[in-house]
C-alpha cells in the first residue's frame, strides 16, 4: 500500500505528514481534479506536437500530401479578366502562348507589342481563329503567328505558370502545375500543330520559353548546329536543381505525341532534356533559353 501512496504523492494527489508512523491525507477533490486535468493536457499537447512533427516530415517528402486549396478561380467579369491578362502580358518574363479569335487578339495587340518591343527575350506564340486578313498583329514584332480556320478554346498562358481560359460569359483563372501541363499539351496537339504559319519566324536574338514543344519549334526554324541552349530545371531522379548550357545534338517531336525532348551536349556529356513532368529524360526543364552561337 505504501507504493501506491508514494505514487499518488508524486502526482500531488496526497499529502504526507513526516512522523512515525507516516500519515497520509488526500488533497481536496477540486485540487486533485485540476492536477489530473493539467497532467492529461500536457500529455495530449506532447502527443499533438509529435503528430504534427511527423506530418511535417511527410509533407516535405511527398508534395502530394500538401493540403492546399486548388489554384482555380472563376471570373464572371470578362472585362476585368481582359484587363488582368493585358497587365500580365506586359509583365511576362518567359513566354506568352495565346489562342483566340482575332477580336480578342486585336484587343490585346497593344500589350503584345509592348511586350515584344520591351522584353525581346520573351517568346510570343499566337494562334488566331479567323481569316488572316483580320489579324492586326504582324511579323514586325518577331512573333510566332499561326492561323486556325476553325475555332477552339480561347487560351492565354503566361510564363508557363498562369492561364486564363475564356468562355462565353465567364473565364477560368488557373495556376495549378498539373493543369498547366495538361493545357500546354492540349495547346500544342489540338491548336498549334493543326494551324498554318502566317509569318516566318527568325531567331535574331535570345529567346526563352517554359514549353518544351515551343523550344523545339524554335530549334526547327534554325540550324541546330548554330544554336546555344541553356536549360534550368531539375535532375529527374534526384530532383536536384540543375543549370546546363551547350549545343543541340538532336530533338524529337514525334507525330504520336509520345516524345517531346532534345539532346544537349555540355562539357562533352550528353543530356536528354524533357519538359514539365518529364518521365524518361535526364533533365526536367522549367526554363529553356535559345540563342545563336556567337
Give the positions of each predicted feature.
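Primarily the HKD phosphodiesterase
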Residues: 85-139, 229-256
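PLD-like (HKD) phosphodiesterase/transphosphatidyltransferase domain
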Residues: 30, 34, 39, 43-124, ...
